[in-house]
Amino acid sequence: MKKNNFTNEQMKDILELYNSGNSIYAISKLYNVTHKVINRIIIENNLIKRDGRKKHFYNQTIFNNIDSPEKAYWLGFILADGYINEKKAFMRIKLQECDKNHLDKFVKFIDGDKGMIKYETHNITYNKQYYVEVNGREFIKSLNNHNIRQGKSSKEHIAKIPFEYRKDYIRGLFDGDGHIEEKRIDLVGSQEVLEYVQRYLKETCDIHVNRILEHCNTKRIYIGFNRYKVLKHLYYDECISLDRKYKMVKLLLQVAMLKSGKIGSDSLNI
């Protein structure tokens, strides 16, 4: 529907929806038009656009309901590796240059555009660091509702995730705050986060992670003997994940099966 196809009553409703706090993206979805159409209506009616920081359009309500593996994964990843400023209403994810394509995945997930991805140069190493900054109070509020808050380091709280998506949520945690190597894997987080992972692995994989260790100002768990079993469970085929870690996991599992002589077998301790 084009702008000139709206009735006067619909135009009035659109302006009222915007004045009531609804996002341009949400209104455009409601009327099945592009965000540019709604944006033009707002400008032509001399309304002041909210949140001057926001220059890109995206789905601000993407995290309102966690009803897919992708939503659960990104929620876990943001909890582990995202930064939130509640006062200025923005969220930022910053990654090293080799992981830039992960930001491409995130932008596509929120229906954004690649112009949201920017980079800066590290003042010591001079390496490029890529980041995406998402602005919008509605978006930040949805993250808050899932226990992602400003200043969360070492104080992270777990979201209520449907059971069938918990492994995706935990994989997001591992991609953000985990370390994977041949002899062990580990995860850094708050006491609450690590206890959550402990319970999940015990219930679903019959794996006991007994000790939560102190690590600087936070906590850490290590998994050695059962690491392959955990990795196989979390990093299933074609799952959304950080490419670098996904490739590492698949290589480790392949090497483990070759060493065991049980290629193609599910009986290996993985």
Region spans (language model):
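Internal intein/HINT superfamily modules and their associated LAGLIDADG
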Residues: 1-270
